[in-house]
A protein has these predicted regions:
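A short beta-loop-alpha structural element at the N-terminal edge
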Residues: 5-18
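Active-site rim helix/loop that mediates acceptor-substrate recognition in acyltransferases
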Residues: 15, 20-53, 57-66
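Conserved beta-strand segments that form the floor/walls of ligand-binding pockets within enzyme
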Residues: 49, 61, 76, 81, ...
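Conserved glycine-rich acetyl-CoA-binding loop
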Residues: 55, 69-70, 83-94, 106, ...
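A short, glycine- and basic residue-enriched loop/turn
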Residues: 68-69, 74, 117
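Conserved acetyl-CoA-binding loop-helix of GNAT-fold acetyltransferases
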Residues: 77, 82, 88-101, 113
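Conserved active-site alpha-helix within GNAT-family acetyltransferase domains
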Residues: 105-109, 115-142
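C-terminal "cap" of GNAT-fold acetyltransferases
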Residues: 135-174
Length: 174
């Protein structure tokens, strides 16, 4: 019998499992400090994980924020990690879709991501030019890597710079 995949909000006791996932999913990046600070800190986040039995096989973090010009709710999708033996099986897709649905129910108006346009475009993300990141972006995915998507027909955030919690205020993260 195979274990069914379950997506749910994480709890504080699962932080060690969450942090163990990221070096496997991103061996060339050190994401554990920002993930830990966001989950344990005072930032408003939506932390979701996919479990296969007791094993955490994927995690996504959405940080809720406003912008300089608009205090309306936006969310930053980052990071999203899937353990290597579950990549390419739709686990990340299901996790993102679940998160977008939950964010819509929470009243979030627009979700932002910095990543591969081919991957995130399948969810409806499009290049973003109005709401700016706190620091210049790396050239990893080109000019179209900064993307956003309004939720449930809601109006997008006003143009301006994102106002993110302190853990995201590290230039190296961008």
């Amino acid at each position: 019998m195979t274990d069914k995949l379950i997506i749910r909000r994480t709890i504080a006791e699962e932080l060690a499992q969450i942090l163990a996932l990221y070096p496997l999913a991103f061996p060339d990046e050190e994401l554990r400090p920002v993930v830990s600070r966001l989950i344990e800190g005072e930032a408003q986040v939506l932390s979701l994980a996919t479990f296969k039995g007791e094993a955490l096989v994927a995690h996504v973090l959405f940080t809720i924020f406003g912008s300089e010009e608009d205090k309306g709710a936006g969310a930053l999708l980052a990071p999203l990690g899937v353990v290597p033996d579950h990549q390419g099986q739709g686990v990340g897709n299901a996790l993102v879709k679940d998160g977008l649905k939950r964010l819509g129910a929470m009243g979030v108006r627009q979700v932002f991501v910095f990543g591969d346009p081919a991957y995130y475009g399948r969810f409806g993300f499009k290049t973003e030019r109005q709401v700016l990141t706190p620091y210049p972006l790396s050239e990893e995915y080109g000019d179209d890597a900064w993307q956003s998507m309004p939720l449930a027909g809601r109006a997008p955030l006003a143009a301006g710079r994102m106002s993110l919690p302190e853990p995201w205020m590290e230039p190296a993260l961008w």
